[in-house]
């Protein structure tokens, strides 16, 4: 079997990569390990969208400038037809699954679920084929181009590309987190009691009665009139690319969930009628392998709001680093009107001419990745990668010789904000 493009990973970056390339006439196979598209949204219960806009003055008014547009905007608009009064950061993951199915089908993308790439074949500076396993079958797929949108950089790792695991000083990664939701919560009472609960949480943590090292109880509203979304578990000092470590982390996080629910029910009447209604299928990974590509995006470049000539996406989410060793979360925020650009070169492996990387595993330092890892930005990176492959294919170029001005022109024509 042969395609023009194989995309590994069906999260937002992989979907955007596949759809953007297929819309330009390429034959595309999208390989996804689970049974649905959406990645962190579908399998890790990640919610909500972190801010993908900046605020700027328009005359005397303050208005939003949306930085993540293109396919991301299309996806959000299509989703919002199903959900009344949906705010910019909100979504219903179940409807998003349907939207992503529709978008890939309409573009003509072949989607292979329950499948993972486990080996690659290379020829000089090209990947010639990938070996996929699905339902106990081994499948060889040849392609002209490949995009790694796996999050963990599995494809570029198998191909032998240079990479950095976690932070540069000790290879420790940001913590893993399993999100969960509770219904039947008195949200008004919880909001009133939240400061007291937070202090009590810290007291019990200091006594060792709470084992979760996270410094606070992080929750989000907006998923239901009596539902709380928790992003509160924290598993540290384990390797997200080691299957035995990840298996350990899954159990630790579920234990933390049980512990936290007990604490809330015991100490707040807001949870008297509450019930656990959902736990993420898989633990969420903030950081793992990051490509060491043609350009390694740095934290300083983000802080300085660098404008790269080969910019293919924008961002201004804060540099949000959850301590890899335990308690604490650091933030470096951007001011109104401030944003940075992400260069095409950060999607380029040094080793191959027909491989691009999209999503949270692009070429970036620990600090820079802490900002670019959010889903709206990842979606834009995927669209840029898929569009670049379509240009390379249609002009007989490789990914390193793509005309970045032509790439930028095509992206803006398709609604991207550069």
Residue ranges: model-predicted function:
Residues 20, 26-27, 32-119, 174:
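Conserved N-terminal/central alpha/beta ligand/cofactor-binding core
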């Amino acid at each position: 079997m042969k395609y023009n493009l194989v995309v590994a990973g069906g999260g937002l970056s992989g979907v955007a990569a596949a759809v953007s390339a297929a819309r330009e006439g390429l034959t595309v196979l999208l390989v996804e390990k689970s049974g649905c598209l959406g990645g962190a949204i579908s399998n890790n219960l990640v919610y909500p969208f972190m801010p993908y806009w900046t605020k700027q003055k328009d005359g005397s008014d303050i208005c939003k400038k949306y930085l993540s547009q293109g396919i991301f905007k299309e996806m959000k608009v299509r989703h919002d037809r199903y959900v009344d009064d949906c705010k910019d950061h909100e979504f219903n993951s179940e409807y998003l699954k349907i939207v992503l199915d529709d978008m890939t089908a309409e573009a003509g993308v072949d989607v292979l679920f329950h499948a993972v790439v486990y080996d690659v074949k290379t020829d000089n500076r090209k990947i010639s084929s990938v070996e996929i396993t699905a339902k106990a079958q081994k499948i060889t797929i040849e392609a002209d181009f490949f995009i790694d949108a796996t999050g963990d950089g599995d494809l570029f790792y198998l191909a032998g590309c240079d990479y950095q695991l976690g932070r540069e000083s000790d290879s420790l990664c940001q913590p893993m987190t399993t999100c969960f939701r509770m219904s039947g919560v008195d949200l008004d009472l919880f909001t009133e009691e939240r400061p007291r609960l937070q202090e009590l949480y810290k007291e019990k943590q200091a006594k060792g009665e709470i084992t979760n090292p996270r410094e606070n109880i992080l929750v989000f509203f907006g998923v239901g009139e009596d539902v709380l979304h928790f992003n509160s578990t924290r598993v540290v000092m384990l390797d997200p690319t080691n299957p035995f470590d990840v298996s350990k982390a899954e159990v630790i996080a579920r234990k933390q969930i049980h512990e936290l629910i007990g604490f809330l029910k015991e100490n707040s009447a807001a949870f008297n009628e509450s019930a656990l209604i959902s736990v993420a299928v898989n633990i969420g990974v903030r950081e793992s392998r990051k490509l060491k590509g043609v350009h390694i995006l740095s934290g300083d470049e983000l802080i300085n709001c660098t404008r790269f000539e080969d910019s293919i996406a924008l961002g201004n989410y804060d540099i949000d680093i959850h301590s890899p060793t335990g308690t604490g979360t650091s933030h470096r925020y951007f001011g109104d009107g401030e944003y940075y650009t992400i260069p095409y070169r950060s999607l380029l492996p040094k080793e191959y001419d027909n491989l691009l990387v999209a999503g949270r595993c692009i070429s970036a330092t620990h600090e820079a990745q802490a900002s670019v890892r959010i889903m709206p930005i990842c979606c834009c990176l995927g669209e840029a990668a898929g569009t670049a492959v379509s240009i390379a294919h249609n002009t007989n170029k490789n990914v390193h010789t793509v005309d970045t001005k032509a790439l930028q022109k095509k992206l803006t024509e398709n609604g991207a904000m550069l």
